[in-house]
Amino acid sequence: MLRAINQNSAKVVKSLKQQLVVLEATNVVAYTGTKSFTTTKTFNNTQTKPKIFTSSNVLSFSSPSSSNVFSEILNKRSYSSKGKEITMPALSPSMTEGNIVQWKKKEGDQIKAGDVIAEVETDKATMDFQYEDGNGYLAKILIPEGTKGIEINKPIAIIVSKKEDIESAVKNYKPSSQASSTPVQEEAPKPKQEAPKKSTKTYPAHKVVGMPALSPSMETGGIASWTKKEGDQIKAGDAIAEVETDKATMDFQYEDGNGYLAKILVPGGTSGIQINQPVCIIVKNKEDCDKFADYSVEEQSSSSSSSSQESTPSSSSSSSQESTPSQSSSQQTTRKSGERIFATPAARFEASSKGYDLSAINGTGPNNRILKADVLEFVPQKQEVAQQQQQQTTTTTKKPTTPTSSGEFTDIPHSNIRKVTAARLTESKQTIPHYYLTMECRVDKLLKLRSELNAMNTVKISVNDFIVKASAAALRDNPVVNSTWTDQFIRRYHNIDINVAVNTPQGLFTPIVRGVDMKGLNSISTSVKQLAEKAQNGKLHPSEFESGTFTISNLGMLGIKQFAAVINPPQAAILAVGTTETRVVLSNKPDSPYETATILSVTLSCDHRVIDGAVGAEWLKSFKDYVENPIKLIL
C-alpha cells in the first residue's frame, strides 16, 4: 500500500496486514506493503538522504510541529538492508568450536537452500556446512578460511536476500554482540522477587556429561544399560553406556580424555531422555567420586538459575521488550502425536539447548521445515515452560517402561525405533503418490551361475546378491529412478547406494551397500552379510543406515509370492522381491513342447512425482534383462 500525503494535517495510513504508519509532515511517502522501497522525498522542505523502508521495520513516522523533526522508530531488524548473520554451526553433539577449512562460496555468490557454503572441521571430522535458511547472496565473509578455534554461534558470514543489498549490508553491519541503539520504552520497576534458595555445597572440578545425539534425527534417547559403574576408571574411547536412539542401540563412547565415573544421574532402562540432558558426572581424580554421592541436578539447576538472576536482574525484561517474535502463543503449531518434525540440525541444537519442544514451533522453511531463526523467535507459553522444566527434572526418576497386562490384552510400550518407523511410513503413504509395477523374471540361468560360482568361491553368493547387483545396473541404465523429490527440484544422484531391508528383533533396519555399481558380487555379498549381522546385534553406525538412493525389500525367503513395499522417503522407488516358484511353460525346444522354469516375481513401487509409468517400466525391463542374463553382471 503506497500513498503520498500532501496536506499539512496529520494523516493515518493503515494497512490491513501490517502495522499503522502515522504521518504529520508535508510530501511524505508512506508504505506498509511487503517489499522495500527507497525514498528521497522532502520532509518539511528538508531534503533527506535516500533511505530504505520495509513493512517489517517501519512502525511510525512523526513530525512534531514544535520542532519539525522527522522521527523514525525502528523496532525490528531489516535484513533487506543489514543482512543476516550466519554463525558457526554445531555439526556434532560434542562440538564446542570448529575451524573453517575452506569457503565453497565467495562474496557476491548466490546461495540456494541446501547449498554447501563452507567446509568445517569439527572435533570429529571435516564436514560440509549446508545453508538451509532459504535463498540469498553471500554479502561478506567475516571469518577467513584457515581460521581455527571458532566458537559455536559466532558470526562467520553475512547473507542478504537481494544482490543489490550487499553494499549496504556490509557498510551497516555491526556484530550482534553490539547492542543496537534502538530506543526502548522503559518499564515501571517491578517489585523485587525473592531469589530461590541456593545450594551452599560446592563440588570438586567435574564434567557433566549430557545425553549425546547419536543420529541426525535423534531428539530423545534411552539408557539401555551402563557398561561402567560408579567409581570405574574411564579412558578416552571407552563405551560407558548403551544408548537406544531412534534407529538402533549404540555404544556411547566417552571421548573427552580420561577420568572416573563419579555419579550416574539416569539409571539404566530409562527412556525419553532429552538431548544434552545430564546423565552422569566425570571427575579427574578417583578420590573425588565419593563427594558426588548426594549430587542433584535439580539442586544445581536451581542454584545456577538463582545466580544468573542475581547477576542480570533486568536481562529477561529487556530481552522480551527488544524481541518482536513473529510467532505468538496463539499462533503456535500443535502437531499430532507421532507426526514427524522437519527441522535443520542448527534448529534442533538451539531448541535442545533452550529446552523447547519442536512440535510447538512453526516452521517457515521449505515444507514447513523449522529453521534456527524460528527457534530464536519462538516464545513458549508459561504453561509449556513449566511442563518442560517438570519433564526434564522428572526424567531421571522415571522408571523403565514395561509391558502392562490385563486378562484380555497386553500393552507393549513403543520403542524409539518403532515410533520412528511408524512416523516415516505414515509420512511416506500420506505425501508420496505411490504406484506399482509388477514383472516376472525367469531365473534358471541365474541359479545355475550362482551354483557354479559358489562351487569355486569361499564367499557364498545368494540370489539376493544378484538382485542387488542387477538393481544397480538397471539404475545406471535408468538414472531417473535414482532420484529424489524436493519442492524446488528433482535431485538425481550420481552414486548408487542401495538400502537392503533387514528385519531384527528391535525393528526394521535398512543398512546401505554403497557404490554398488562399482562392486563385484563377492564384495556385495560380504557387505550385505556384515551389515545384516550388525543390524541384528543393534550395532549399526548412523553412517551405515542414513541416506541411500534406492531400497530393496526381500520376503522371498518367507515364502511370500508377491507384495508391494512402502517407499523409503526421500527416495523415489523401492523394489519388493517375492519367492521363486517352478512352473510349466512353453518350450522353444523342437523335441519338447513344454519345460519347467523357475519364476521370480518383483514389484517396483514408484513416486509418480519423479518417475513416470513408462520410466518405471523401462527400469523393470532392464532389471529383467540382467536377471535373466546374469553373465552381463560379471562382465
UniProtKB/Swiss-Prot annotation:
GO terms for molecular function: dihydrolipoyllysine-residue acetyltransferase activity. 20 to 30 alpha(2)-beta(2) tetramers of E1 + 6 homodimers of E3 + 60 copies of E2. Belongs to the 2-oxoacid dehydrogenase family. Residues 187-197 have a biased composition (Basic and acidic residues). Keywords: Acyltransferase, Lipoyl, Mitochondrion, Repeat, Transferase, Transit peptide. The pyruvate dehydrogenase complex catalyzes the overall conversion of pyruvate to acetyl-CoA and CO(2). It contains multiple copies of three enzymatic components: pyruvate dehydrogenase (E1), dihydrolipoamide acetyltransferase (E2) and lipoamide dehydrogenase (E3). It comes from Dictyostelium discoideum (Social amoeba). The modification N6-lipoyllysine is found at residues 124, 247. Residues 171-204, 295-338, 382-413 are annotated as: Disordered. Its cofactor is (R)-lipoate. Its EC number is 2.3.1.12. The gene is pdhC. Residues 342-379 form the Peripheral subunit-binding (PSBD) domain. InterPro entries: 2-oxoacid_DH_actylTfrase (IPR001078), Biotin_lipoyl (IPR000089), CAT-like_dom_sf (IPR023213), E2/Pdx1 (IPR045257), E3-bd_dom_sf (IPR036625), LAT1 (IPR006257), PSBD (IPR004167), Single_hybrid_motif (IPR011053). It catalyses: N(6)-[(R)-dihydrolipoyl]-L-lysyl-[protein] + acetyl-CoA = N(6)-[(R)-S(8)-acetyldihydrolipoyl]-L-lysyl-[protein] + CoA. Residues 83-160, 206-283 form the Lipoyl-binding domain. It is an enzyme of class 2 (transferase). Disulfide bonds: none annotated. Residues 174-184 have a biased composition (Polar residues). This is Dihydrolipoyllysine-residue acetyltransferase component of pyruvate dehydrogenase complex, mitochondrial. Residues 298-334, 387-404 have a biased composition (Low complexity).
